[in-house]
From Swiss-Prot:
Cofactor(s) annotated in UniProt: Mg(2+)
Protein name: Dermonecrotic toxin LarSicTox-alphaIV1
Alphabetical list of CDD domains matching this protein: GDPD_like_SMaseD_PLD (cd08576)
Tissues and organs where the protein is expressed, per its UniProt entry: Expressed by the venom gland.
Organism lineage: Eukaryota, Metazoa, Ecdysozoa, Arthropoda, Chelicerata
Function: Dermonecrotic toxins cleave the phosphodiester linkage between the phosphate and headgroup of certain phospholipids (sphingolipid and lysolipid substrates), forming an alcohol (often choline) and a cyclic phosphate. This toxin acts on sphingomyelin (SM). It may also act on ceramide phosphoethanolamine (CPE), lysophosphatidylcholine (LPC) and lysophosphatidylethanolamine (LPE), but not on lysophosphatidylserine (LPS), and lysophosphatidylglycerol (LPG). It acts by transphosphatidylation, releasing exclusively cyclic phosphate products as second products.
Amino acid sequence: WIMGHMVNEIYQIDEFVDLGANSIETDITFDENAVAEYSYHGVPCDCRRWCHKWEYVNDFLNALRRATTPGDSKYRRELVLVVFDLKTGDLSSSTANKGGKLFAQKLLQHYWNGGNNGGRAYIIISIPDIDHYAFISGFRNALKEAGHEELLEKVGYDFSGNDDLNSIRNALHKAGVKDKEHVWQSDGITNCILRGLSRVREAVRNRDSSNGYINKVYYWTIEKYVSVRDALDAGVDGIMTNEPDVIVNVLNEKAYKQRFRLANYDDNPWETYQ
């Protein structure tokens, strides 16, 4: 999965897919009532990126729905996975549950079209703070209460704060998520700073072990050719990047062409390849 980083304005959906992304990451900020308000990152953000692009969340979700609904004039067949990077820093552990519930209701209305032929992309809820695990519980419960538990088949989970893997596993269990139940594990840092791959390798070992909790591992945010090759050699399933075309170029290199291909809609992002 080539994951376009910081796609927060509607026009960027096409921009990143045109560059080769089959997945995008969108930042979501919350107001004081735990309501998702903007698709917005703010400063600081990655080097060589403008940090201030934004939309109202409802507008972005409506556009995203169109981009992932077959038959729509805005449909982009390649776009199969969306990561919502949830900026839960202003939520407390007590309002996280409410935030998750309200965000699920927003997705249900604006992205899934009330459960009636909405957007088809798989969704990852990515949370920076393991203490906010109740966001996931609230999200899951809201869909169940709305009578749309089936949409959870399309939802996966990630904690992005580079915490100890066992701590993340415990947070997932507290949220009601079982081992290997749609779990993506991220590792990374802003592209301004170099980061080693030791934790990535630990996550890959967990993914590949019979008693791990992880389905997929992704690394963020890189666009240097050597970094991309190193990440692929470490066995990641996804790379988050500001320059999707760089990842496309590396995947076309002889050393990687046989081992990797771009994921499409028929590839289940919750299955671990053996």
